[in-house]
C-alpha cells in the first residue's frame, strides 16, 4: 500500500554504487547560525555517535547523569547507521554536573560542553553538512554529469524513507489513529505518526508534479516559497517569466502543502492537482484537522549547496550542505542506484 519508490526528476541513474557499508560512509554534522550564549539554564553538549539513534543516546545520557529524559532536548534526529555529531541540551538551571565534559558510553561520546539560555528544539538548526562515501561506482561519468546537473537545478524535496519507519510502519500507525480512532498517549510517538502522514501526502503531491515535469515550474495558483524562509506568496499568472528567472536564481521555489486546517491559499491548476491527490485520502485529512494540525508549506525544490567530490578508483567521496529538514538520500537517489 505504501510504495516509497518515488519518481526521479532526471530518470533512473546509469551508475550503481554501494552505500553505507559502515557508519563512516555516512557522516552528518549539525550546523547552527550564531553561537551559544555560554550561560543560562541549559547545559549544551556536542555529541559524536555511531551506530545509535538519537533517542538511544538520550536514554543512555539520562541514565548516566540521573536525569529524566524529558529534561533533554535536541534540534534534530540523526540516522542510526551513520557517524554523526549533534547537539543536545539539558535543563539544569544553576546546576553543575561533575565530569560531564568527558562523559562517554558505548557508541557515543561528548566532544564539547557549554551553556545556553534556551533549550534546543526542532527548527533551531540551519542545516546539516554531509560527507558520503559511495563505493563500487559503476559509471563515474554519469555520476559526475548528474552532480553538475543538480548543482544548478536541485532535486525534488521529498521526505526520505526513514521518515516513514521500517516498511512504512509509521504510516500504518498513522492510519490506526486517524481512521480507526486508536488512542496513543505518548506525545512524541503521536507527533511522529502525524508527521509521517503529512509527509506521505506531501510526497504524493510532489511525485505527481515530478511525473508531469512541473515540480520546479510555477503553475497558476501555486504557493511560492522564498528559499531558506517560510515566507510565501501565491502565483496568479499562468507563466511568469520573472518568476521563472527567480527560480533559476535559487531565490524562490514552488511549494506543496503539509496538510492540516487549510487557509485556502492555493488556486487554479495547482489546486486541481492537490485535490485529485487528496481525493483518496479524505479520512486522513479529516483526522489531521480534528487533531489540530495546521496546513504548512514545503518547497518543491531542494538545493544541495557547497557540493564537492573526490574520485579514487571506483570510490567517490561526496560532500554537501542541506537545509534543516532535508534528506541526503533524496539527493543520492538522483545520482546513483544503491
From Swiss-Prot:
Enzyme class of the recorded protein, top EC level: isomerase
Keyword annotations from UniProtKB, A to Z: Isomerase, tRNA processing
Domain TRUD: start-end pairs: 154-303
Entry similarity comment: Belongs to the pseudouridine synthase TruD family.
Function: Responsible for synthesis of pseudouridine from uracil-13 in transfer RNAs.
GO BP: tRNA pseudouridine synthesis
Catalytic residues (UniProt): 79 (nucleophile)
Record lineage: Bacteria, Pseudomonadati, Pseudomonadota, Gammaproteobacteria, Legionellales
InterPro entries, A to Z: PsdUridine_synth_cat_dom_sf, PsdUridine_synth_TruD, PsdUridine_synth_TruD_CS, PsdUridine_synth_TruD_insert, TruD_catalytic, TruD_insert_sf, TruD_pseudoU_synthase
Protein's UniProt name: tRNA pseudouridine synthase D
A matching Pfam family: TruD
GO-annotated molecular function: RNA binding; tRNA pseudouridine(13) synthase activity
UniProt-listed Enzyme Commission number(s): 5.4.99.27
SUPFAM superfamilies to which the protein is assigned, alphabetical: Pseudouridine synthase
Any one Gene Ontology cellular component term annotated for this protein: cytosol
Enzymatic reactions: uridine(13) in tRNA = pseudouridine(13) in tRNA
Superkingdom, taxonomy of origin: Bacteria
Organism of origin: Legionella pneumophila (strain Lens)
Amino acid at each position: 500500500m505504501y510504495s516509497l519508490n518515488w519518481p526521479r526528476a532526471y530518470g533512473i541513474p546509469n551508475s550503481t554504487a554501494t552505500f553505507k557499508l559502515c557508519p563512516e560512509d555516512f557522516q552528518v554534522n549539525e550546523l547552527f547560525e550564531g553561537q551559544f550564549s555560554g550561560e543560562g539554564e541549559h547545559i549544551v553538549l556536542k555529541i559524536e555517535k555511531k551506530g545509535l539513534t538519537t533517542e538511544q543516546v538520550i536514554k543512555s545520557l539520562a541514565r548516566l547523569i540521573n536525569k529524566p529524559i524529558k529534561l533533554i532536548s535536541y534540534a534534530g534526529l540523526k540516522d542510526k547507521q551513520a557517524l554523526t555529531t549533534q547537539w543536545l541540551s539539558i535543563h539544569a538551571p544553576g546546576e553543575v554536573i561533575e565530569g560531564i565534559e568527558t562523559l562517554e558510553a558505548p557508541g557515543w561520546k561528548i566532544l564539547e560542553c557549554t551553556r545556553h539560555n534556551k533549550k534546543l528544539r526542532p527548527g533551531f538548526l540551519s542545516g546539516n553538512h554531509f560527507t558520503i562515501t559511495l563505493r563500487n561506482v559503476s559509471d563515474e561519468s554519469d555520476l559526475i554529469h548528474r552532480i553538475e546537473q543538480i548543482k544548478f537545478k536541485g532535486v525534488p524535496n521529498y521526505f526520505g524513507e526513514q521518515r516513514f519507519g521500517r516498511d512504512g510502519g509509521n504510516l500504518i500507525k498513522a492510519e490506526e489513529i486517524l481512521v480507526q480512532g486508536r488512542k496513543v498517549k505518548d506525545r512524541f510517538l503521536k507527533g511522529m505518526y502525524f508527521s509521517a502522514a503529512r509527509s506521505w501526502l506531501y510526497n504524493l503531491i510532489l511525485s505527481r508534479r515530478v511525473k508531469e515535469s512541473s515540480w520546479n515550474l510555477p503553475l497558476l495558483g501555486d504557493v511560492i516559497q522564498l528559499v531558506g524562509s517560510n515566507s510565501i506568496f501565491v502565483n496568479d499568472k499562468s507563466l511568469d517569466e520573472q518568476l521563472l528567472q527567480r527560480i533559476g536564481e535559487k531565490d524562490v521555489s514552488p511549494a506543496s502543502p503539509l496538510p492540516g486546517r487549510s487557509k485556502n491559499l492555493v488556486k487554479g491548476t495547482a489546486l486541481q492537482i492537490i485535490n485529485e491527490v487528496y481525493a483518496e485520502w479524505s479520512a486522513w485529512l479529516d483526522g489531521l484537522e480534528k487533531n489540530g494540525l495546521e496546513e504548512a508549506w514545503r518547497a518543491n525544490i531542494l538545493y544541495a549547496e557547497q557540493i564537492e567530490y573526490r574520485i579514487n578508483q571506483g570510490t567517490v567521496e561526496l560532500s554537501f550542505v542541506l537545509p534543516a529538514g532535508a534528506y541526503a538520500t533524496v539527493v543520492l537517489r538522483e545520482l546513483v542506484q544503491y
